[in-house]
Amino acid sequence: PKIRSQIIDAIDALAVLGRDLITTGPSLSGTWRMLWTTEKEQLYIIKNANWFGTQVGDVLQVIDVENLKLDNVITFPPSGVFFVRSSIEIASDQRVNFRFTSAVLRGKDWEIPLPPFGQGWFESVYLDDDIRVAKD
């Protein structure tokens, strides 16, 4: 809990320092690896990967600003993936709204389509060529 609080405080400090930055332009497009999150849904999936006899591999967000698409990808080595596609809307200089459009859980020889329900938003409070810090 103490480390979590320190990380959130650091993110909030970055948000204040970067409040005038534009982080929703073309430089937001790319494949971003998640290193830390407070997202309950992602944490639940990560925690319960052992249900499938595996552990979590990469957790990625693939953002395409030009085509207004967002893909959330959680890999389960050696051949599994949970994939959620979303449409996005640039709402402000730092805020992106998204709406889920499709979801699938895929293994080596099987695939389960899931209903894509939900929507949300995130604000990229810091962005450079290597690091993106977002909050929601």
Regions inferred by a protein language model and the residue ranges of each:
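Soluble ligand-binding/transfer domains with enclosed cavities or grooves
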Residues: P1-D136
